[in-house]
């Protein structure tokens, strides 16, 4: 499977895990949510080890751009809140930076 698949899956595992923590600590949902939250975060960390790159730092830097896109998709799809123009501009800037890191000749 390709890097993009792992990046997107990792992002949704991280966002899911963090969102479950958010629900417990900010919305008074049951503490039982912390178990699947921890599992999601473990899977997230594992998935980033599957990225085909020589350095962890470069994988994490590129992942950052993908994470931001997935976060806005989460906000729209799960939280039912539409991104605004500044969200789109910000994600564009981040994707440009991630692309420079990913596609730079080395």
From Swiss-Prot:
PANTHER family: UPF0060 MEMBRANE PROTEIN YNFA. Keywords: Cell inner membrane, Cell membrane, Membrane, Transmembrane, Transmembrane helix. Its main location: membrane. One of its GO terms (cellular component) is plasma membrane. This is UPF0060 membrane protein CHU_3331. It is a multi-pass membrane protein. The keyword tRNA processing does not apply. Belongs to the UPF0060 family. It is found in: Cell inner membrane. The keyword Hydrolase does not apply. SUPFAM superfamilies: Multidrug resistance efflux transporter EmrE. The chain crosses the membrane at residues 5-25, 31-51, 59-79, 85-105.
């Amino acid at each position: 499977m390709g890097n993009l698949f792992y990046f997107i899956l990792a992002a949704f595992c991280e966002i899911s895990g963090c969102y479950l923590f958010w629900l417990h600590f900010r919305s008074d949902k049951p503490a039982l949510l912390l178990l699947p939250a921890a599992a999601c975060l473990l899977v997230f960390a594992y998935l980033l080890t599957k990225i085909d790159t020589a350095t962890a730092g470069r994988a994490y830097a590129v992942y950052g751009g993908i994470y931001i896109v997935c976060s806005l998709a989460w906000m729209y799809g799960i939280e039912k809140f539409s991104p605004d123009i500044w969200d789109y501009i910000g994600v564009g800037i981040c994707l440009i930076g991630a692309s420079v890191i990913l596609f730079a000749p080395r």
